[in-house]
Amino acid sequence: MAKCGSCGPGYKSPLDAMKGPREEIVYLPCIYRSTGINKPDYLATVDVDPKSPSYSQVIHRLPMPNVNDELHHSGWNTCSSCYGDSSKVRNKLILPCLISSRIYVVDVGSDPRAPRIHKTVEPYEVFWKCGLANPHTSHCLGCGEIMISSLGDPCGNGKGGFVLLDGETFEVKGNWEVEGESAQFGYDFWYQPRHNVMISTEWGAPKAFALGFKMEDVQAGHYGHSLNVWDWTEHRLVQTIDLGKDGLIPLEIRFLHNPDADQGLVGCALSSSIFRFYKEKDGKWAAEKVIQVPSKKVEGWPMPEMPGLITDILISLDDRFLYFSNWLHGDIRQYDITDTRNPKLVGQIFLGGSIQRGGPVTVLEDKELECQPDPVTVKGKIIPGGPQMIQLSLDGKRIYVTSSLYSIWDKQFYPDLLKEGAVMLQIDVDTKKGGLKLNPNFLVDFGKEPDGPVLAHEIRYPGGDCTSDIWI
């Protein structure tokens, strides 16, 4: 989205982005894999303009040409990292498929309200050219290429490498990393060129998580617990930071948006902790735990203690607030991170989860709550599942949230979600003193989709957002 005759996509700076227009539509993948409905996953377009007659409704569905892909995350062909290049246009959404290893390129430029398939990258191209599989996070690079992280090799073993796509033809160019430099596991990544660094995170071996979560797989070393530090210029793995038992399964990673910043935050799902990572005086990188969500002692659940399971985090464009979701406990939290070493909890809201009152789980010991939260009802619907993917408006005043994590894990931890479908909700944010409040007028009920209940995951704005765009 150009702002002048001589500039490229996105915004000049994160603070400029905060002044961008209010979101009117969003894109999000909807997943049928594991639900028992043999239909393709699809990209949904949702109207989020309160002035529109189709507000909080799905206005378009783009089915993929195959079944059982497991659409998951998405990225752009170009973004604010190419702001200085007026020849670049943000008009293609990149959709890596977590299980099939396909990569779909979707044209959202010709008609933003009715996207269409532009190209399909078949799995064998990723397998043969890169030796990788299970693509996850897609980021556009300042050079015009597209970089996609991988979780494994074609045999289902863990392998943290990166696929490069040509930004014009969308052909697989090969690996970003130097040959032999892959990490043990992969997941998310964020780059900060002014410090010549990229840091990637670790979920686990696809052959482990693909069949459901087992604590024995964690104990057997099939899940990650490290941050991998890469030399951005030389494409080499130069350091691995072991987060230990307090940093099991580090997923979403965010540098501060200021391109000069030498620090950021990462959410560790299983340990339910937030680590701050930072550059030391000698140029090495280090990490320290700054937030810990206590587990709850429970009965009526597969394990005696229930972690929060931090599955998504994001940072506001002014680098003032951190938000994250506890998928199992059922809450979203807002922290003031003016002092990144000492985050301050300023907002919290419960939206379903596994510990709500009246459910099968009884909390025996809770270090935070005096009683179990009540179920949440929006427009007459009791919200199933727990809050998972979150997206913040450019101005920081609205959060959109969906409830699906990954179809097999949804089936394991929230089986009713497959019967009722996911939901998309909207939260109003107090950006002055902190605070989160549910918007009672917004509900997208994916249980009422034409082909049956569906799972909905990551949310994207057409003009970019605080998790898609990186400033260099």
From Swiss-Prot:
Subcellular location: Nucleus; Cytoplasm, Cytosol; Membrane
Function recorded in the entry: Catalyzes the oxidation of methanethiol, an organosulfur compound known to be produced in substantial amounts by gut bacteria. Selenium-binding protein which may be involved in the sensing of reactive xenobiotics in the cytoplasm. May be involved in intra-Golgi protein transport.
GO molecular-function term, one example from the UniProt record: methanethiol oxidase activity
Superkingdom as given in the UniProt entry: Eukaryota
Name of the protein in question: Methanethiol oxidase
Involved pathway(s): Organosulfur degradation
The keyword Cytoplasm is assigned to this record: yes
This protein's UniProt keywords: Cytoplasm, Membrane, Nucleus, Oxidoreductase, Protein transport, Selenium, Transport
Broad class of the protein's primary localization: nucleus
Catalytic activity annotation: methanethiol + O2 + H2O = hydrogen sulfide + formaldehyde + H2O2 + H(+)
Topology with respect to the bilayer: Peripheral membrane protein
One GO biological process term: protein transport
GO cellular component terms, semicolon-separated: cytosol; membrane; nucleus
Alphabetical list of SUPFAM superfamilies matching this protein: 3-carboxy-cis,cis-mucoante lactonizing enzyme
Disulfide bridge positions per record: none
Broad EC category: oxidoreductase
Family, as annotated: Belongs to the selenium-binding protein family.
EC number per UniProt: 1.8.3.4
